């Protein structure tokens, strides 16, 4: 049921081409037909009555000829018939014929078959006529003592409904049900009886619970759930009762039912904020996550733990449970692991960080032993990032983490290796005492690195942080080892020439028998000459990168060689050794330049790389103090500034998060004492059971914006003109995965409009759930029609259609009014999200759909334009505020958002202020949007185009 509907309707479709049966033929079938004919006739009568027909002449026929039958199908249909048939005269008096029906009910309540008794009792719950129910009360009471539980539990429901609607018919119902509950053994019967007492006489329910509070654990789970609900409601309304029932909730945490444990833990948290209660509830949640196999359940319960953590008073308690929380990592689902690691990272403290790191190190090693899988690679990335964060927050742990992680620099998964490299770069800059260890480990794994991107980063780290003579010499040795024989061009040509000297091997292919056109056999053999080639894997890594045409790594190598050569010159006093080392570095650069300009590589060297290597050669040949400072001091300072800015940004975001969580109390705020609080003030807290029920029904209330333009009236769309015969307008109600159109249809003519039908169709990833039913509109009458549309993805959808109708008494064809299109706003499905720079770049490279939007706005300030775009698109700016502060005439920023369907949307804003056009010139530039699906990219682009210009107020 959607949020816009409060009533459940029964819709029975009748084929349009079928001819409606006449009352005479139905009467004949009901009187003289066999059981099968009577069954079909009764079905037709029910459908006709549901569609508005009265059929008063058939009532007595059904009472005389159908009601006495004992066929079970007939009896089921009769229950539906008696529910829908009009039972009163126009002035509200009960029809005389219903007295006969009442007697039939009484006989069914005394029927030996328990199903007929039970279904009759269920039917009586739906009756709204006290005169019909009054004669049946003794029979209903007697059903409480029936041997079968199906009859007894439906008898309880019937008594509860009758007591609620007509209390005078059974005034002693609470007492009767209480006595029944005390002696009842069946779980479902006890549950129904207890539920009735909760709503009809809560004091009796509490009295019963008090007498059996120690046996609650032995009850069935359905009864335990009701007991949890009762305790919550009682303590919510009257907090002084908490001490009386909290022990019962503690006991229910040990229930065998996961549902009971979950509800009991949630109730315990609301009843008590004592550390023991929070710990017990959290422990219960953790056990549920580990034992439940459904990943959706795991995620829901994890969210409860995260909510607990958000409360400052509970965070300290949860910190002691970090190791228990880490047991959840045994779950193979990546999303569960991701949430678990984030929760553990938020809760880790100096008391348990060592244990956390040990567990995470074991998990990292485990990922190396299992078969490679996409989720394994991503999980390894998550572990690396978590260890990275732990090491930054707790520097003492870095020494334990680094040796394990650096093994993964040689990993085939570039993303995980890149995360390790980022961690190593930050660790070597922050922790001076670990530099020797990191350099040593880096030299150990250097030759095994497979990815050119990781190789480039490792080169930079070695060039920047090798400070001793031995380390510098080791780097040069590793570079020579990775480069192979030099000069590269000559050695490659010799290798080629050397492979051509032996006679070309002649290989004979397999002999095949072929059938010629004449039907005879012909023998064919294939002689082929081939030259054996050496596998590329035998090449040293750096040589392989260069021959593949990746000369960006050569530019990085040139910078590294320059740094270590300048540092070697400063460390070693002997001129001969200085010149020898510098010459060796220059020789390596020169041979790479020579290779780049030859025809051997798959791609030639770029001009940028040539310029970089040439610059490094010039620096080494001149050795000026200025260039020495730039290479050996200012490069490191740049990294230091970048890491400091990043750390400051993280601290700022954490501060904002903690400010959101911490409830600030003003000096003049009143203090609430429980003993002095009025009873009605205690109910100010929201009832969690009521909220969850509303959420399940789709009736969750969204907080309306303070802006009056954001009210519901802003979502009303006019569908027809005021001069059209039928006026229509629609309120578009957006839920998470569906849209409800509440269409107001007004007949503006003096004629009766028959078969007035709203015909809708959709464009985009929208699906109409059901066709709205036709209706009849009196002159100047109006009606509301609801249509439900399912949404499957985030893209601009269009709903269009028309209203068709017949004019009563007119012989003309059907009339049609075309409706205006309804455009569905994708902003209802997009939420701001965050990701790392590396993830952004990776997604940017992977996503194939790009939409380039040209900036066309009246906004004159760069920052104002960016904020306007963020507000219009619901995206989050990933570029730090410091990078956007100041004024330089241009701006570049990265934006990111996720849809509720899990789709990612990236945007890059590149804008400038044309200074030559004056201070009032509007912002110009482009916004590039990338997404996995074409619909997302186009929809977001359309949204930006529509909202670029700021409305003047």
UniProtKB/Swiss-Prot annotation:
What ranges cover the HEAT repeats? Answer: 96-131, 132-168, 240-276, 277-314, 316-353, 396-433
**Domain of life assignment:** Eukaryota
Q: Provide the topology term for how it sits in the membrane.
A: Peripheral membrane protein
N-acetylthreonine PTM positions read 2
Q: Where in the cell is it found?
A: Cytoplasm, Cytosol; Golgi apparatus membrane; Cytoplasmic vesicle, COPI-coated vesicle membrane; Cell membrane
Q: Which GO CC terms are listed, alphabetically? A: COPI vesicle coat; cytosol; endoplasmic reticulum-Golgi intermediate compartment; Golgi membrane; plasma membrane
InterPro entries xrefs? ARM-like, ARM-type_fold, Clathrin/coatomer_adapt-like_N, Coatomer_bsu_C, COPB1, COPB1_appendage_platform_dom
Quote the function comment for this protein: The coatomer is a cytosolic protein complex that binds to dilysine motifs and reversibly associates with Golgi non-clathrin-coated vesicles, which further mediate biosynthetic protein transport from the ER, via the Golgi up to the trans Golgi network. Coatomer complex is required for budding from Golgi membranes, and is essential for the retrograde Golgi-to-ER transport of dilysine-tagged proteins.
Q: What else is known?
A: Brefeldin A induces dissociation from the Golgi of the beta-COP and presumably the other coatomer subunits.
Answer yes or no on keyword RNA-binding: no
Q: Which residues carry this modification: N6-acetyllysine?
A: 494
Q: Which GO terms describe its molecular function?
A: structural molecule activity
Q: Where are the transmembrane segments?
A: none
Processing and modification events after translation: Proteolytically cleaved between Ser-528 and Ser-529 by CAPN8.
Q: Partners and quaternary state?
A: Oligomeric complex that consists of at least the alpha, beta, beta', gamma, delta, epsilon and zeta subunits. Interacts with ARF1 (myristoylated); this interaction is required for binding of COPB1 to Golgi membranes. Interacts with CAPN8 and PRKCE. Interacts with SCYL1. Interacts with COPG1. Interacts (via trunk domain) with ARF1 (via switch I region); the interaction is direct. Interacts with KCNK2 (via N-terminus); this interaction increases the channel-mediated whole cell currents and promotes plasma membrane expression of KCNK2. Interacts with STX17. Interacts with TMEM115.
What protein name does the entry list?
Coatomer subunit beta
Could you confirm whether the keyword Membrane appears in this record?
A: yes
Q: Which GO terms describe its biological process?
A: endoplasmic reticulum to Golgi vesicle-mediated transport; intra-Golgi vesicle-mediated transport; intracellular protein transport
Q: What gene is this protein a product of?
A: COPB1
* Signal peptide location: none
Source organism of the structure: Bos taurus (Bovine)
Q: Which UniProt keywords are present, listed alphabetically? A: Acetylation, Cell membrane, Cytoplasm, Cytoplasmic vesicle, ER-Golgi transport, Golgi apparatus, Membrane, Protein transport, Repeat, Transport
